[in-house]
Amino acid sequence: MATYSASDFRSGLKVMLDGDPCAIVENELVKPGKGQAFARVRLRNLKTGRVWERTFKSGETLEGADVMDRDMEYLYTDGEFWHFMEPDSFEQYQADANAVGDSAKWLREQDKVIVTLFNGSPLAITPPNHVELEIVETDPGLKGDTAQGGTKPATLTTGAVVKVPLFISTGEVVRVDTRTGEYLGRASK
């Protein structure tokens, strides 16, 4: 794997630090008037999600992480693992609850997702930014409910609960932003 010196660091670069794959979130190269230049770096551990700050002298190097983002299709869950398939090679991967995390509430069978692989095993799952899901349970809308007003909780087919306007009723398909969990609007037919 490639090695990167402190002057090569940039946001999004994936490196190995203390045996764990990390992504550089922020990078600032500091050149003081006296002394050696250094890089002040914010890193996010890809396994745990923890973010911390480290300082590297200009001569220090880090090894690149063997991390790849792949487009895959979500197949099914068997209760313990979530199964994904690469559409080109039909190779299948199984991810545990740590890798899937909060993404589980947005996954439907045959959805396209981005799977982050580390040494051939799934490390993280990223669902599409927007999904269209049907509402299976919500309070009934009453005559006179308008778009200007309050919201009510609605349960979607995947089990996720989002706040929707009062005029939305059970059985409707809505667009939801998976990053924030916010209602975006009714799905276009």
From Swiss-Prot:
Keywords recorded for this protein, A-Z: Cytoplasm, Elongation factor, Hydroxylation, Protein biosynthesis
UniProt GO BP: peptide biosynthetic process
InterPro entries the UniProt entry points to: Elong-fact-P_C, NA-bd_OB-fold, Rib_uL2_dom2, Transl_elong_fac_P/YeiP, Transl_elong_KOW-like, Transl_elong_P/YeiP_cen, Transl_elong_P/YeiP_CS, Transl_elongation_fac_P
Pathway membership, UniProt: Protein biosynthesis; polypeptide chain elongation
GO cellular component, one term: cytoplasm
Subcellular location: Cytoplasm
Family: Belongs to the elongation factor P family.
Name assigned to this protein: Elongation factor P
UniProt gene name: efp
